[in-house]
Amino acid sequence: MDSGDIEEAGGNGEEEFRSGPRLGGSKYRPVVAHDRAVVEMSSIDPGSSSSTLKNIKVVAPGDVGAGVRGPEDGVNGHQKESKLELFGFDSLVNILGLKSMTGEQIQAPSSPRDGEDISITQGHPKPPALKMGTMMGVFVPCLQNILGIIYYIRFTWIVGMAGIGQGLVLVFLCGLCTFLTTISLSAIATNGAMKGGGPYYLIGRALGPEVGISIGLCFFLGNAVAGALYVLGAVETFLKAFPAAGIFRETITKVNGTAVSESIQSPNSHDLQVYGIVVTILLCFIVFGGVKMINRVAPAFLVPVLLSIFCIFIGIFLAKTDDPDNGITGLRLKSFKDNWGSAYQMTNDAGIPDPTGGTYWSFNELVGLFFPAVTGIMAGSNRSASLKDTQKSIPVGTLAATLTTTSLYLISVLFFGAVATRDKLLTDRLLTATIAWPFPAIVHVGIILSTLGAALQSLTGAPRLLAAIANDDILPILNYFKVADTSEPHIATLFTAFICIGCVVIGNLDLITPTVTMFYLLCYSGVNLSCFLLDLLDAPSWRPRWKYHHWSLSFVGASLCIVIMFLISWSFTVVAIALASLIYKYVGLKGKAGDWGDGFKSAYFQLALRSLRSLGANQVHPKNWYPIPLVFCRPWGQLPENVPCHPKLADFANCMKKKGRGMSIFVSILDGDYYECAEEAKEACKQLATYIEYKRCEGVAEIVVAPNMTEGFRGIIQTMGLGNLKPNIVVMRYPEIWRRENLTEIPSTFVGIINDCITANKAVVIIKGLDEWPNEYQRQYGTIDLYWIVRDGGLMLLLSQLLLTKESFESCKIQLFCIAEEDSDAEALKADVKKFLYDLRMHAEVIVVTMKSWDIRSEGNSQEDSLEAFDAAQRRISDYLGEIKRQGSNPLLANGKPMVVNEQQVEKFLYTMLKLNSTILSYSRMAAVVLVSLPPPPLNHPAYFYMEYMDLLVENVPRMLIVRGYHRDVVTLFT
């Protein structure tokens, strides 16, 4: 029996149904191919309901057209997948392990039942890349990067200059900065899966791609140049320990201006360059060997370093005290007390105390000198792509390395301050080698290997950081450095080596060194700010496994980083921030759009919610009123298929904003059933949004599917917007094509939209002559004429002022025509309107037009066009009424009410529109744009009649805005 059939098979059918699909008698069994914690539901237990399943054939959707499957395929193939099909989603078995589970917006692969084939790798699968654990992946790299040359050759000098007390403060301050940064790093790194890139990945996902790339590239540059610093330190120590190894020797006859009895052969500066290039190339070969080679070599660099530090401490305890003139006193309380205070003074270029020297050292300068000795905490996170478990290794390994080195420094301050006199601390550059047991050479080896180990870690982490930035595909210029997930970043390594060799060739890095320190501090402040923002927002997705964090700690860490930057050098701080700002701007201009769900988006969301709540449900005060137009994109007329919105509608929407401030909502309605047109609506919405962005109009796009346009607009006008951010003005095109397209549907829809706007208390702006509306480059001259007939809350006045703020209308002047009754006092009305405009801070020429009872036909030939339109409208309305009378029935309106026609009232409406149109043509035929009040549709009049009224109003006016306000003021007299 096929696995897809359930049939009654005599007396044994039920037994076969019971026993066939059960494997091993278990109801649930593990799915070995994916996750042992995921179980697969067994076949349906027939039980008492088995009788309802008889004689039913079940065919899986994926089997249609695929031929007949064998029994094995039914059990092991698609049957497993189809048991949860009724939920409408892929089962956990199908989605576990996809990259989309990490929060990245990646398209999931199609299911085989979509008709696509599954690609099966032939032969042996590719072995997984070697992954590192906490010790070799994080702790050792961090320790190698932190323990550098400063501890060996400058730390004793720092203790002598700052004293034990301020030395402890100095170490504690710098250690606190890195400790707080490690806490923030641990929190972010344990908040989900982490790909390559280390701090760049964390900062970018928290603060956005622009901030992430700008800080990430600065951090990459800092690592690359730091590699050169470490290489030069190793080579310089080697040449001082073995002068005979110099290739380009120079003869020294004077030392500090004093002639020596015998000339001294010393290595030349070119030796630094040659040896530095050779060492850099050798280190690059190790890096090219991959993670496996680095893991083998790293202990060889670290073990001698730890051994040399151990020998230094043995030498401290075994220091000879029989020669006090040598300056080494052994561990003595007297030395401890003498060295407790600071001794800031002038020194020469070599750091030797000299009253005539050119350098004065203070606490701030010592911070800049010592801080590179605590950097390197990002060495483990830089290789996050090579770690087995980032959420475990990064916090434990980084924190252990930070605490270990900080404790070492604090203990060293106490011991160095108690083992020698201050003069010895300030004059012996290699005091650590002098006191080391059993001989100084072991410290020389430690210095060389520590700097080489730090250089190796820099040349390992920097290329991976650059490759991670390139793989995010934000900056096209970095595409050359892209690598596959399991590949080594060879091109990025070559580029890093090129930068490193260039700095080695320069040789003198005194000006670059502070900038490198700034890049490290800039990265640390970015990590702290990221954790601060995520902690403060506390989004539902913020669930780090590392629980020992708080937004206040991150804030203190970020503040401390910035303070230390300015303590070291405010000028180099400005340079580092300026470089990061330039990269930020470049990414914003040239980079591709990327949405990583960063913290800024969450902050904007929460700020928007808080602002929306603070607005409340009360009406907005006129001083704070902004137009929020609801732009009706395609209500009538046909546009090209690739143009989702009339181009001039976007131009007009921009005219309603002062200096771009405001928001427009562009909506369009698709006729049809939502279930059938949902995908079409999504594509149309994307197309409309893209077009709005192309027109540089700030707004949002919405597509609504409805049975017809009237129902769709009614739903939009009721539900669009939130709180006080609902649209307050409906903007649409005047249907000039209604007479030749549809004599019934367009008028009915047009009148229905206006009535819905009045009911919803929305303002209305109808644009006649939209095709001739000027764009931002078409400058207009003349006047903007307002025909103020009814009180509209000042909306028409406000629109005219907004038009003047645009380049296309800034050369125009405003004329305000007040339409008065025949018995009104024109002069008094004019004076009142001028006073009103003055109080509103608006400039306009006021003209009062009195609508007298005059016969329009006595005005001569100037209004022949209006008269012809009037006569034509009369004839069409008479024919319409005659047709109704001949039918002998009482027709109903669109709202179901009976149509009641008063022919005298119809004549009055037509005559009023005729007089208003003739007045507009008399005064405003050459106006840039005319604004006139919108008359509401008369009750119980057919929509056809209203369209005749409106056609008569706009006759021969090339460009007109028909405006209706709502029952509230949008302008105010008061400040």
UniProtKB/Swiss-Prot annotation:
Expressed in young seedlings cotyledon tips, plant vasculature, root tips and axillary buds. Expressed in root vascular strand in the pericycle and other parenchyma cells bordering xylem vessels. Expressed in the xylem/symplast boundaries of rosette stems, rosette leaves and cauline leaves. Expressed in stipules, trichomes and hydathodes. Expressed in pollen grains. It is a multi-pass membrane protein. Disruption phenotype: Bushy plants with small leaves, short roots and short inflorescences containing a higher number of stems. Alteration in pollen grain development, high number of aborted siliques and few siliques with low number of seeds. Disulfide bonds: none annotated. The keyword Transport applies. Residues 1-132, 189-214, 295-296, 381-398, 456-490, 537-544, 593-975 are cytoplasmic. Residues 1-29, 104-124 are annotated as: Disordered. It is found in: Membrane. Belongs to the SLC12A transporter family. This is Cation-chloride cotransporter 1.
